Amino acid sequence: MKVLILACLVALALAREQEELNVVGETVESLSSSEESITHINKKIEKFQSEEQQQTEDELQDKIHPFAQAQSLVYPFTGPIPNSLPQNILPLTQTPVVVPPFLQPEIMGVPKVKETMVPKHKEMPFPKYPVEPFTESQSLTLTDVEKLHLPLPLVQSWMHQPPQPLPPTVMFPPQSVLSLSQPKVLPVPQKAVPQRDMPIQAFLLYQEPVLGPVRGPFPILV
């Protein structure tokens, strides 16, 4: 009986050990499966991160790519452009373009500026001097004839002639009235040379004109 009990106990102990081994194996398997699942999850996370990073890089490349294409269209050739013309051909000379003066408004404005800056010189008309008519009271006396220092035969011939009216004499204003800006040169009068048997009318024509209010030569009173 004791032997049977011992054998049962040994069998139970072995069964327990077997169960424990099974449990340990199961736990090991579960741990290994959990480790595999963890690694698989980690791989999925890494893959997702790599895909997200790749997507962002692709978006950046898509944004940069059209700008690079536009630059490549504007500057298609990076190297120097070869000259197709031969070196012995001279360049064409450019003839200067001559613009006529009537097309330039600045040139047309120069004469107007000159006209405004330098006014035109206006000539003043010669003033008309008053003419006094000859009256009978204007006559020479014997004392005036003596002052002329004329020869005696000429004076005697004048004495026997009747008095005649003389042409009107021109009255000149004093020199202060004349304009200083435009001086007028008067002709130099020629002195009369008395001749023998010369009438008084011809002699008076050669007399010098008297300036100022002094009256001209007068006829001789007989």
Swiss-Prot record:
One of its GO terms (cellular component) is extracellular space. The modification Phosphothreonine is found at T27. Keywords: Milk protein, Phosphoprotein, Secreted, Signal. It holds the Pfam family Casein. The keyword Signal applies. Residues 1-15 form the signal peptide. It comes from the Eukaryota. Coiled coil: none annotated. It is found in: Secreted. The modification Phosphoserine is found at S30, S32, S33, S34. InterPro entries: Casein, Casein_beta, Casein_CS. Mammary gland specific. Secreted in milk. Important role in determination of the surface properties of the casein micelles. Belongs to the beta-casein family. PANTHER family: BETA CASEIN, BETA-CASEIN. This is Beta-casein. The gene is CSN2.
